[in-house]
Amino acid sequence: MKIKTRFAPSPTGYLHVGGARTALYSWLFARHHGGEFVLRIEDTDLERSTPEAIEAIMDGMNWLNLEWDEGPYFQTKRFDRYNAVIDEMLEAGTAYKCYCSKERLDQLREEQMAKGEKPRYDGRCRHSHEHHADDEPCVVRFANPQDGSVIFDDQIRGPIEFSNQELDDLIIRRTDGSPTYNFCVVVDDWDMEITHVIRGEDHINNTPRQINILKALNAPVPMYAHVSMINGDDGKKLSKRHGAVSVMQYRDDGYLPEALLNYLVRLGWSNGDQEIFTREEMINLFSLGAVSKSSSAFNTDKLLWLNHHYINTLAPEYVATHLQWHIEQENIDTRNGPQLAELVKLLGERCKTLKEMAQSCRYFYEDFSEFDADAAKKHLRPVARQPLEVVRDKLSAITDWSAENVHHAIQSTAEELEVGMGKVGMPLRVAVTGAGQSPALDVTVHAIGKTRSIERINKALGFIAERESQQ
């Protein structure tokens, strides 16, 4: 049997981390078994579905590199197929037309609730032989079995059973002729030959209804696996107040897709104590049997740790391709300065996100108009004038501009003046970067370049001279 899974988001908003994890698990399961992964857009909610949301879902899937083998299919383009199946069911007697008014259904619901009963349709039209005009408004309901039960072996939770007496004759076509969600899903899974449905636990109650419809159609029933919810670190359902929940927001905040995927796969699945997984390892090791039944807690600190790990372990050239977007957001012209791959090497240890890296690298490419006030007050004092003049002259004399030779110039200045390295290094750092923090000074000065470094030292000396004149 060829394994076939699907990810079927509704385009009523962005791709959130819960949906991304479901997509990842479905994708991994298909890839592990050499099967196929289908992308289906469940856009039957015409009022809430938007083109922007569809684009956001596609952007998220592409950024995570969860490539699909079929699709994207759109349910709104398959209405003719759904209605044809409904008409066949009406002919076969597995569905029926319901003419009950909204007022009657509301009254029925109120009466049932007053008696402490579960609100459900009473089947009046199922057994009715009244004649109705062809143009009289009606819905179509599925004739759910009235006895027995539905049992399915959830691939994560084990056997789950529902009594058919607890299930309603659900509406499968509205009065406006549009098919409903639960019915469209069934026909899609049938037509697309889906073998395994992996989705959130909030769909468990839909499963017996969908299984009954599949059986009424004499269609194969897929295996189902329901993944537990993701909570915030406070134990409550993950929401915006816990931080970013949109996949693309994590991109915007400077996370690498590898970090988010690695984090999401561990939110409910494990392989011993292993924390770091390459994409290939995820594919080789993933199984539904190792997915936890318990809900998971989202921990941003853990995600940040993973992101820092991947910034420093993935190829700098690859990380640079993602950094480029953040550099553009900061409007930094990188033509006059180090290559972005070199920047990743320079700042990787200090920066936990690419956004942080982009926001802290401007001095490598552009001159600054003023020094950081606190850093200048502390380090650009009259006592720093001589160390800066000496190190400037030594840097000017370098013919082979390298980090090693820059380091030698700084060290020999300290030795010549018989001062500690900090007495040279800190004023030099503020002079060339404008701030009090940077990567190692020799590689920083080397990356900034000889001409620009000397110009900035002269600017710092001018700042010191002006400071002296005001005393």
From Swiss-Prot:
The keyword Nucleotide-binding applies. ATP binds at residue 240. It comes from the Bacteria. Zn(2+) binds at residues 98, 100, 125, 127. A motif ('KMSKS' region) lies at residues 237-241. Its cofactor is Zn(2+). Keywords: Aminoacyl-tRNA synthetase, ATP-binding, Cytoplasm, Ligase, Metal-binding, Nucleotide-binding, Protein biosynthesis, Zinc. It catalyses: tRNA(Glu) + L-glutamate + ATP = L-glutamyl-tRNA(Glu) + AMP + diphosphate. GO terms for cellular component: cytosol. Its main location: cytoplasm. One of its GO terms (molecular function) is tRNA binding. Belongs to the class-I aminoacyl-tRNA synthetase family. Glutamate--tRNA ligase type 1 subfamily. Monomer. This is Glutamate--tRNA ligase.
